[in-house]
Design a protein with these regions (language model features):
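A gly/proline- and charged-residue-enriched helix-loop-helix capping module
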Residues: 113-129
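Histidine-centered divalent-metal-coordination microenvironment in nucleic-acid enzymes
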Residues: 81-97, 140-155
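Short secondary-structure junctions
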Residues: 67, 71, 127-136
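Acidic/His-rich structured neighborhood in mature extracellular/periplasmic domains
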Residues: 95, 111-114
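Generic hydrophobic/packing signal
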Residues: 96-102, 125, 129
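N-terminal regions immediately upstream of nucleotidyltransferase
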Residues: 1-89, 100-112
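Catalytic cores of NTP-dependent nucleotidyl/adenyl transfer enzymes across multiple folds
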Residues: 44, 54-57, 122, 130-131, ...
Length: 212
């Protein structure tokens, strides 16, 4: 039995050989990799994002834990965790895990505890960045630096490893998220597809930005 792929061409052209097909796919991959390099963050842009994240996290650690750690009690989410951030830089998304004592303190509030919590986190950041535009609504506190917006999701760690995050809409509530399950799923899909899923996600985002 022939080892050639069963790609049938019009009469007279015969089967498409592996030797013909492979160079075409090599070219596609090379163009894909070059496009990905062209839209990936530059080293300067990447370091700027890292610095902004570290500064915001250090500020919140001082307020809630009495330390100045630039990374403790936080983790990246979104395109920065997925390694799909592209230029031009837009935002850095992160979870900041608050002490459980903060949750119990806000439980004494009668109205929209979640909104009050976001405003407290915003005020803690405003003390360090008084001239920077900020907002706190929905699930995030947004710190709008000139080059990046850092979007902070205040969260509480549950015994299950999941998190509660704020939702200020409709009177306020907590939403349960399972980021680690999502992370494991993305890792599995990426590995099963030759580590191409994350670059494809970045490519898709680049095409989307070019249209809007």
């Amino acid at each position: 039995m022939s080892a050639q792929p069963a790609y049938f061409a019009p009469a007279g052209l015969g089967l498409l050989s592996v030797a013909q097909a492979v160079p075409q796919w090599i070219g596609v991959r090379q163009r894909f990799e070059q496009f990905h390099r062209n839209i990936a963050l530059t080293e300067l842009q990447y370091q700027d994002g890292v610095t902004k994240r570290a500064s915001v996290v250090a500020c919140l650690n001082r307020s809630y834990y009495g330390t100045s750690s630039p990374s403790d009690n936080s983790f990246l989410v979104g395109s920065w965790w997925e390694n799909t951030a592209i230029r031009p830089p837009r935002d850095v998304d992160l979870y900041f895990v608050l002490p459980i004592s903060v949750y119990h303190r806000f439980q004494s509030y009668q109205w929209n505890r979640q909104s009050a919590l976001l405003q407290e986190v915003k005020a803690a950041l405003a003390a360090t960045y008084p001239d920077t535009d900020m907002s706190g609504d929905g699930q995030v506190v947004v710190v709008r630096f000139r080059s990046y917006a850092v979007e902070v999701v205040p969260a509480f760690l549950l015994q299950s490893g999941q998190h509660w995050i704020c939702d200020t809409h409709n009177g306020g509530s907590y939403k349960q998220t399972d980021l680690w399950a999502e992370i494991r799923h993305i890792d599995a899909v990426d590995q099963a597809n030759g580590s191409n899923i994350r670059p494809l996600s970045a490519l898709r985002a680049g095409v989307f930005r070019s249209k809007f």
